[in-house]
Amino acid sequence: WRKPYPEKEAAQIKDLVKEAAANKVDFVWAIHPGLDIKWTDEDRINVLNKFGMMYDLGVRSFAVFFDDISGEGAKADKQADLLNFLQKEFIEKKEGVSPLIMCPTEYNRAWAGSDYLDVLGKTLDPAIHVMWTGNSVIHDITLEGQEWVNKRIQRPSYVWWNFPVSDYCRDHLLMGPSYGLDPNAIHA
């Protein structure tokens, strides 16, 4: 993630961004630095530079993912510091950019056993969207669940509704009516 995309891949991304815009799709480019981030100024600048490269390719929606990791990369205070830096030094300075999205390490209630979400709520810039899957990875979105997380992150969560997700049945095509989205939870 620290290195620029090779020219061929950069051209493909630029084409994807154009095609998405032509079809009224918001192309969100995400980076996942958590596995080996050092939390140094050098790494902050590396992420900032990658954002700049993507902006030059036409990307206007950005996300930083810290899901499915442990160790040094999973520290809420360090994540918030990096995200706040990107908010101030990039998102607020670039024209036409959507709000920054982050996927936290503890992105569902079953895995939220520490003060991680409370730290994000207290320290993360309120303009940054925080993704949330519900009470587990694949779960109904309920009013009770939304109220629980929103209190901790001190903002409405950015719902990552894992429906239908085929992680648990890769040999099936999931089709049929939607269920599990409480209409009262939409604006909770």
What are the roles of these predicted feature ranges?
Residues 69-188:
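Catalytic-core regions of glycoside hydrolase
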